[in-house]
A protein has these predicted regions:
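Residue-level detection of the helix-turn-helix DNA-binding "recognition helix"
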Residues: 29-33, 175
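Polybasic, glycine- and aromatic-enriched phosphate-binding surface used to engage nucleic acids
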Residues: 19, 24, 29, 354-532
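Signature of N6-adenine DNA methyltransferases within the class I
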Residues: 2, 35, 119-120, 141, ...
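Polyanion-binding surface elements
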Residues: 2-24
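Short, solvent-exposed alpha-helical "recognition" segments
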Residues: 6, 32-40
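Conserved SAM-binding strand-loop segment of SAM-dependent methyltransferases
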Residues: 182-193
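Class I S-adenosyl-L-methionine
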Residues: 2-7, 44-180, 197, 266-273, ...
Length: 532
């Protein structure tokens, strides 16, 4: 291929993302803001090379769309360093630490890879004592932290298996195994466990402990294929797919431990996985908090036993822990009665009993009883929002402008016809004579009954009640803003976002409001004691 042919070679968005080690969304953003220039309306290799060479040091890297590129590492160069280190006298543990610390945040985010801290590995595996003749698998072994701990526990290295797609990590794991045991393992395989699993379907393991990729970007066709292969239902995030794949390779009476994103335990898309987990005998649920640098998501682990001969009973107890803060026991059966089978294990049994009682009261919900609208995304607040009102501009409000009894004075203004905005819902909902505005990013419900047809940015959302809804706007706002409802919301969902799906599952006590104009804790206690 000539230099000219090389430079004019057409490059797809996917190929560009792979070359620059970023998401396709970042490529689209760079094209949209003009940072990445197309040639004749398509990308060429020269466009990519020019961007790589000229844009990396540009001041434009401070913009949100480009933050992912700022900490990009050269993986080929890093791989050469690791291969050289593997042949040296440097210990495998040191190489492992060097490799993990050299991976950029953008790479880890793209691959869904966050290497498990040693204290979490030890804590998750602390109860393993029966090791004679037992087999162990880590299907996403990384540089081998769980695998090395299994060998330290006494599991024979010949019976320890691992998969990982990262060749560097696989070779580091093999070196560490040899250093700790003298055994040169052929059981650590560089392959995608989700696809490789089908080739090892007859092999089962006594112990499977792992930290699977969280939210790794895989194409839709593969995602649906894996979902069908492992019967994962609606749970198709990579962490859930690995859970179902692992379950198929676990022996009867085998034990499984997985470190998951906290969303696994409370978000609707993981409900099928939670239902499956509740058929196992769960021994521990542990919240390790924000365990990974640069990641806001909490890391939460479960440890459970697959025992068809001894299904969970009404007496089955789970040790629930906020790591190094508190421990308490919860009935496993109790999670079956929580909306969406959410694992709200941060609360104690007596609090869950109150939740069960509350949901037994006559109630309706907002599901199918309201129309919903997301807040407006301008795509560029600095350009489209003004701090002073001029002709043709109207107020637009943020989540932080929403209070229980008022809206803050307007401080931003936008073109009345919302021209140029990236996301706009049905204007009929924004301009409804009655609607409820609520904060989106918040750990408590804060909502306001709006009668002035206000616009809101996407840090707030809105909904409009159906005409036949039996509770008035003022009554509903008094309930949703109450300390009681916020306690209930926090106890069930335990999230920093106010999601529509969660609001739709809150109980609205329509019978109570037949006798009460607004909600109050005192009158509700009387109503509850009479109704139960």
């Amino acid at each position: 291929m000539s230099i000219m042919d090389y430079e004019l070679k057409k490059i797809t968005i996917k190929e560009a993302a792979e070359q620059l080690n970023v998401s396709a969304v970042s490529i689209h953003n760079w094209i949209k803001d003009g940072s990445l220039q197309k040639t004749n309306n398509f990308l060429t290799q020269k466009d990519i090379d020019d961007f790589r060479n000229n844009f990396l040091n540009s001041k434009k890297l401070s913009s949100r769309a480009n933050k992912q590129y700022k900490d990009l590492h050269n993986h080929n160069s890093l791989s050469k360093e690791i291969r050289k280190a593997l042949k040296s006298s440097m210990s495998g543990d040191l190489i492992s630490s060097k490799y993990e610390s050299s991976l950029s945040e953008s790479y880890k985010n793209k691959e869904g890879i966050y290497y498990t801290p040693q204290y979490i590995v030890e804590d998750m595996m602390k109860d393993i004592v029966d090791v004679e003749g037992k087999t162990f698998l880590d299907p996403c072994c990384g540089s081998g932290n769980f695998i090395i701990e299994a060998i330290k526990k006494g599991i024979s290295p010949e019976n320890v298996y691992g998969f990982d797609v990262d060749e560097n990590a696989v070779e580091i794991t093999k070196k560490r195994i040899k250093e700790i045991s003298g055994y040169e393992s052929d059981n650590i395989i560089c392959a995608d466990f989700l696809s490789q699993k089908s080739k090892t379907k007859n092999q089962k393991f006594d112990y499977i402990f792992t930290n699977p990729p969280w939210g790794k970007k895989i194409n839709k066709v593969d995602r649906l294929r894996y979902s069908s292969l492992y019967n994962s239902g609606s749970s198709i995030d990579t962490s859930a797919l690995f859970y179902f794949a692992c379950l198929k390779m676990l022996k009867e009476d085998g034990e499984i431990g997985m470190l998951m994103p906290d969303s696994f335990f409370n978000i609707t898309t993981f409900e099928d996985a939670r239902k499956s987990l509740l058929t196992l005998n769960i021994s521990r649920l542990v919240d390790y908090g924000k365990a990974f640098k640069g990641l806001m998501t909490k890391a939460v682990a479960f440890v459970a036993t697959k025992a068809n001969s001894q299904q969970p009973t009404a007496n089955s107890q789970i040790q629930c822990e906020i790591y190094n803060v508190k421990k308490h026991l919860r009935s496993q059966e109790g999670f079956l009665n929580v909306p969406k089978h959410i694992f709200n294990f941060h609360i104690e049994e007596k609090e869950n009993d109150i939740i069960r009682q509350v949901y037994s009261l006559p109630h309706i919900t907002l599901k199918d009883n309201a129309e919903w609208a997301l807040g407006i995304i301008t795509g560029n607040n600095e350009k489209l929002c003004r701090k002073e009102r001029t002709e043709g501009l109207v107020p637009i409000f943020r989540g932080k402008d929403v209070f229980k009894d008022k809206m803050a004075e307007p401080s931003l203004f936008v073109n009345e016809n919302l021209e140029g905005c990236r996301q706009v819902a049905d204007l009929r909902l924004y301009k409804s004579p009655n609607k409820i505005i609520y904060r989106f990013i918040s750990n408590k419900i804060v909502c306001f009954h709006d009668t002035e047809q206000r616009y809101v940015l996407n840090s707030a959302n809105v909904f409009v009640l159906k005409d036949d809804f039996p509770v008035s706007y003022s009554q509903l706002v008094s309930l949703l803003n109450s300390d009681f409802m916020n306690w209930l919301f926090r106890s069930v969902f335990n999230t920093h976002k106010i999601l529509r799906g969660d609001l739709e599952m809150l109980p609205i006590f329509h019978e109570y409001f037949k006798e009460n104009e607004v909600f109050s804790e005192e009158t509700f206690e009387v109503y509850k004691s009479i109704s139960l």
